[in-house]
A protein has these predicted regions:
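Short acidic-aromatic linear motifs embedded in glycine-rich loops, typified by GG[WY][YF]DAGD(H)
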Residues: 1-129, 133, 138-144, 148-154, ...
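Short coil/turn connectors between adjacent alpha-helices in alpha-solenoid helical repeat scaffolds
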Residues: 97-100, 163-167, 214-224
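Amphipathic alpha-helical segments of tetratricopeptide repeats
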Residues: 182, 233-234
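Amphipathic alpha-helical protein-interaction segments enriched in hydrophobic
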Residues: 194-205
Length: 283
């Protein structure tokens, strides 16, 4: 029940395809934004909104915890990561990435639940994109945390999701990505505007999963990794001839840069600002 008459409930919010596109954008936004309205205010419980952005902290977790990246900032979470020493206080990076990934899962589940009975033209594609974004979030959770809670759109509201184990989660993600690749709903490479996901993103995610399959499941999948990588390249990707162009503001318009991007997280000056992404890299 809405708190006031101007608030929409789920039955009112989704009426047209544009409504569903806005709902899908809400899922995409969880990868790049600190909140819906203000990059200086996070919608998760952190001390610093800038430290809550997913791409920023995913990079930090992967690179700063080894010798690939060093930072002289005095933030406690940075010191812990660079020295691989941990305290009882939750680390800002591990907390942000975990919470943001679970936020993607939650938003995608709600979107899929609310769109399951609709029959609008174009909606199956939006649902396929939501399924990929959810599968990719589960991939990050499996890779970094091992055995996260597993929830789907069918889960009863308020019920605690169960943990199915790392191997079972790997198998679910693999099956979900293969289903998206075999179906017609997820767009082909080049069929949708930058940075919407395509089958290239699903194929590349499979390749990344197979590279580390022995850690996730106990069984190596080297040939599958090679096959998936080659299949991705054959979808039309190529290296940008000028490496610097990959970091320009016109990625959505630069054909050379777009040839190299497989799954991009969008930032721009006007609509999707945050203290993450490349802003963090150059600050």
């Amino acid at each position: 029940m809405p708190l006031n008459e101007t608030d929409k409930n789920a039955g009112q919010a989704y009426q047209t395809l544009e409504d569903y596109e806005m709902g899908l954008a809400y899922i995409y936004g969880a990868y790049s934004l600190a909140s819906q309205n203000d990059p200086g205010k996070a919608d998760i419980a952190v001390d610093d909104a800038g430290q809550s952005e997913l791409v920023r902290q995913y990079m930090v977790l992967n690179e700063m915890s080894v010798d690939a990246l060093k930072c002289t900032w005095g933030d406690s979470y940075i010191v812990e990561l660079q020295n691989n020493s941990w305290s009882a206080t939750p680390n800002a990076s591990t907390l942000a990435v975990y919470t943001r990934c679970m936020m993607v899962v939650t938003r995608a589940n709600e979107f899929l639940k609310q769109s399951s009975a609709a029959s609008l033209e174009g909606l199956p594609q939006l649902r396929a994109e939501a399924r990929f974004l959810r599968a990719f979030a589960y991939y990050l959770l499996m890779d970094l945390y091992g055995n996260p809670p597993f929830a789907m759109e069918e889960n009863v509201a308020g019920a605690l999701p169960s943990q199915i184990g790392r191997k079972a989660l790997f198998e679910w993600i693999e099956g979900e990505l293969k289903d998206l690749l075999e179906g017609s709903e997820l767009p082909e490479v080049g069929a949708v505007p930058y940075p919407r996901v395509t089958k290239g993103a699903a194929q590349a995610t499979l390749a990344r999963m197979y590279l580390n399959a022995e850690v996730y499941t106990g069984t190596a999948r080297w040939q599958d990794a090679l096959d998936a990588a080659e299949a991705t390249i054959k979808m039309g990707y190529d290296l940008c001839p000028n490496y610097e162009e990959l970091f320009m503001q016109d990625n959505s318009e630069n054909d050379n840069a777009r040839k190299e991007f497989i799954f991009a997280i969008a930032y721009d000056r006007d609509n999707s600002q945050s203290w993450g992404g490349t802003t963090h890299l150059v600050s």
